[in-house]
A protein has these predicted regions:
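Short secondary-structure junctions and interdomain/linker hinges
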Residues: 1, 73-76, 253, 313
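Hydrophobic alpha-helical transmembrane segments corresponding to the first two to three helices
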Residues: 29-31, 35, 39-44, 48-192
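Cytoplasmic, intrinsically disordered regulatory regions of membrane-associated signaling receptors
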Residues: 41-43, 194-335
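Short secondary-structure subsegments characteristic of cysteine-rich extracellular domains
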Residues: 28, 102-104, 294-300
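Proteolytic-maturation and junctional protease-sensitive modules
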Residues: 1-45
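Conserved, structured regulatory domains from eukaryotic proteins
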Residues: 7, 19-20, 25, 135, ...
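Intrinsically disordered, low-complexity regulatory regions enriched in Ser/Pro/Gly/Thr
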Residues: 19, 29-33, 75, 167, ...
């Protein structure tokens, strides 16, 4: 008897038995074996990092392509952002930019380990999958650590304003941003050595698409969802402080279209750095929520790249205006 591995592409229709496809699936069987191993290489989607839901096969396929395109664009944009940071001396001397670039590195790690995770899960190497799962979890936690530090840095700039000097400020931020995730991952490994590895995207279908991630549901909920909740709440408060600050600065001033547009882009840029869009994950139990979550968060790195480019153009424009003012004030030199 011949057996073939397939994936269910039905939507619970009456003709669901016709909706099976072997595309992307490989049947692994040797003569004499009593079981068949199926290896399917269908892409997964960004929402699995937060929510264990089960969209229809057609929606899952679309979400997978959205994630692939979004993460690829983000990885490209983040790489260019690093080059822009290195090539501009003013960026390298700016403390805020150094905080931003740390978040950029964390997002690069996240995308680098998320994109091949499903492909690695389809391989037979358990140790490689464990490494990928551990690295992916660490990268996600580091990303949220740096987004929280973005909120803290914003608090110092907008609320404290004066007397904000902190000795070895960037070193202390780095210890928290990179060290806390390492401690959390180490504790998970100490408590449960099998906490990382092959993890089905849909828990109700263990033979379906899988990635290398946290296998222990409790560890995932406590470390991942717990940290995301805390960071999201803190950064929402920081965003509220920013809005209040912008409103107070505009009081007594004549508002125009230009200033309003500038404030909107400022808030959008800050929201991206603070990871506010990750809050959509709490409402992504629906298919529509999954689409919004995947689009916004897979593109987070690319949006940060656009924000960096706009900041660079703004800095260059300001420098040009200063040079023009200096030349106008000094006037032509007499012989």
């Amino acid at each position: 008897m011949f057996s073939d591995c397939v994936i269910d592409e039905s939507n619970s229709s009456l003709l669901s038995w016709l909706d099976y496809s072997s595309d992307g699936c490989q049947t692994l069987w040797r003569r004499g074996q009593t079981h068949i191993t199926c290896s399917c290489d269908h892409l997964t989607y960004f929402g699995v990092l937060m929510v264990n839901s089960s969209p229809s096969p057609s929606d899952q396929k679309i979400l997978s392509y959205i994630t692939l395109i979004g993460c690829s664009l983000s990885l490209f944009g983040l790489s260019i952002t690093v080059l822009l940071f290195i090539s501009h001396k003013k960026f390298r001397a700016d403390v805020s930019m150094k905080v931003h670039i740390s978040l950029v590195f964390a997002l690069i790690l996240l995308n680098v380990h998320f994109l091949p995770s499903e492909m690695v899960a389809a391989l037979s190497s358990t140790s490689l999958c464990v490494y990928m799962a551990l690295a992916l979890h660490y990268s996600l936690l580091a990303t949220f650590s740096w987004m929280a530090l973005e909120g803290f840095h914003l608090y110092l700039l907008l609320v404290r304003v004066f007397n904000i000097y902190i000795r070895r400020y960037l070193l202390k931020l780095s210890v928290v941003g990179w060290g806390v995730p390492a401690v959390i991952v180490s504790l998970v490994v100490i408590i449960d050595r099998t906490a990382y590895g092959y993890t089905p995207v849909d828990s109700s279908n263990p033979n379906g698409t899988a990635i290398c991630y946290v296998t222990n549901t409790t560890a995932m909920m406590v470390t991942t969802m717990g940290m995301i909740c805390l960071v999201f709440l803190f950064n929402v408060i920081m965003l509220g402080v920013t809005v209040r600050r912008l409103i107070s600065l505009r009081q007594g001033q004549e508002t125009n279209r230009s200033s309003t547009t500038k404030d909107i882009f400022t808030l959008l840029g800050i929201s991206t750095l603070l990871g506010i869009t990750w809050g959509v994950g709490f409402f992504s139990v629906t298919t529509a929520g999954q689409y919004v979550f995947c689009i916004l968060n897979s593109l987070q790195g690319f949006l940060i790249f656009l924000w960096f480019v706009m900041s660079l153009r703004k800095a260059q424009k300001a420098a040009a205006e200063i040079r023009n003012d200096t030349q106008t004030t000094s006037g032509p030199k007499s012989k």
